[in-house]
From Swiss-Prot:
Protein name: 3-dehydroquinate synthase
Keywords: Amino-acid biosynthesis, Aromatic amino acid biosynthesis, Cobalt, Cytoplasm, Lyase, Metal-binding, NAD, Nucleotide-binding, Zinc
Keyword Lyase: yes
Species: Buchnera aphidicola subsp. Schizaphis graminum (strain Sg)
SUPFAM superfamilies cross-referenced by the UniProt entry: Dehydroquinate synthase-like
Pfam family, one: DHQS_C
Residue positions binding NAD(+): 71-76, 105-109, 129-130, 142, 151, 169-172
Top class in the EC scheme: lyase
Cofactor(s) annotated in UniProt: NAD(+); Co(2+); Zn(2+)
Length: 360
């Protein structure tokens, strides 16, 4: 097992990465024997993993209850959060309880947001089971739910007490979910690390075959990059916003199509293509780098074209509701080369529309 740390003073926490680590002693730190906890998962994962996780929690002496939610992005809502809060109250969980998120990004977001507001804040532990949540969503403290008018519009920053990344969970992950997670992996490489991008160009096929050694390295690399950013800019006041590369366009696709119609990583893949094309059109990104980004996304099996039934103009209202908008001005994360990105504002909307049209 390898351990990284997100350094945030008294709120620092470990990220544990390895194979079959869910059964290791003290893996559920900061929980101690006799502590109360609530496991939150969905119906699919409950059938696959709940008994195993329950066994190890009870073996550790934890008093554990459960909430089993519906499965899918369309259920990342305030209504599902109310299910969690009601269960906590009915089971008489106090302020020293710990919520445990067993699942992907949806479960992690719902659990984290619930933890942030239940009795004004309780601890929670992330046990991410998808590649997307292992490399991105479980680390950093962003929690929230969707609104009809936009993705993740209601939420809070609430850091977990620990993150437990067991790569064995990926062996039961549907292949399209694995591919979806690769979008966030590629994101890190494009905006932060040219060497990692080259490594992905060489190893993406074997990663998709779930080579343990390669996957452990890949997850660790992504978590290291994100942990460094979180330590410097926890509340996204500055360059943490770079992590939203592709998300302004991608969230528009998700909202327009209906949450759950496109997997998050699929929408972000197309969003990264659109952002890269925008950067090329304004003279920042070289055509060769644009083609390399496009090629790697294709190699990973990710979509590079937006939905045919969504016009370029229909992206703009969603993009203007993006959380990076300041004083009515759209701000976009654009790559300027492989391994570097910047935040741009004031880009001509006709250029943005052209980039979208070129990616349809």
């Amino acid at each position: 097992m390898e351990q990284l740390k997100v350094v945030l003073g008294k709120r620092s926490y470990p990220i544990n990465i390895g194979s079959s680590i869910i059964q290791e002693d003290n893996i559920f730190w900061p929980l101690n024997p006799g502590n109360q906890a609530m496991l939150i998962t969905n119906k699919t994962l409950a059938n696959l993993f709940k008994d195993k996780v329950f066994f190890h929690l009870r073996k550790s002496g934890i008093k554990i209850d459960q909430v089993i939610l519906s499965d899918g992005e369309q259920f990342k809502t305030l209504n599902e959060m109310e299910v969690i809060i009601s269960a906590l109250l009915e089971k008489k969980h106090s302020r020293d309880t710990t919520l445990i998120a067993l699942g992907g990004g949806v479960i992690g977001d719902l659990t984290g947001f619930s933890a942030s507001i239940y009795q004004r804040g309780v601890r929670f532990i992330q046990i991410p089971t998808t590649l997307l949540s292992q490399v991105d969503a479980s680390v950093g403290g962003k929690t929230g739910v969707n609104h009809l008018l936009g993705k993740n519009m209601v939420g809070s920053f609430w850091q977990p007490s620990s993150v437990i990344i067991d790569i064995n969970f990926l062996k039961t992950l549907p292949y399209n979910e694995l591919v979806s997670g690769m979008a966030e992996v590629i994101k890190y490489a494009v905006i932060f690390d040219a060497n990692f991008f080259e490594w992905l160009e060489e190893n993406i096929e074997n990663l998709l075959l779930l080579n343990d050694e390669l996957m452990s390295y890949c997850i660790k690399k992504c978590c290291e990059l994100k942990a460094q950013i979180i330590a410097l800019d926890e509340r996204e006041n500055n360059f943490r916003a770079l992590l939203n590369f592709g998300h302004t366009y991608g969230h528009a696709i998700e909202a327009h199509a209906g949450y759950g119609s496109w997997l998050h990583g699929e929408a972000i893949s197309v969003g990264m293509v659109m952002a890269s094309r925008t950067s090329e059109l304004i003279g920042c990104l070289k055509k060769t780098d644009y083609k390399r980004i496009l090629s790697l996304l294709k190699k990973a099996g990710l979509p590079v074209k937006g939905p045919k039934n969504m016009s370029a103009a229909s992206y703009l209202p969603y993009m203007m509701r993006d959380k990076k908008v300041i004083s009515g001005e759209m701000r976009l994360v654009l790559p300027i080369s492989i391994g570097k990105a910047k935040i741009y504002s004031g880009i001509d909307k006709n250029i943005i529309l052209s980039a979208i049209k070129d990616s349809q």
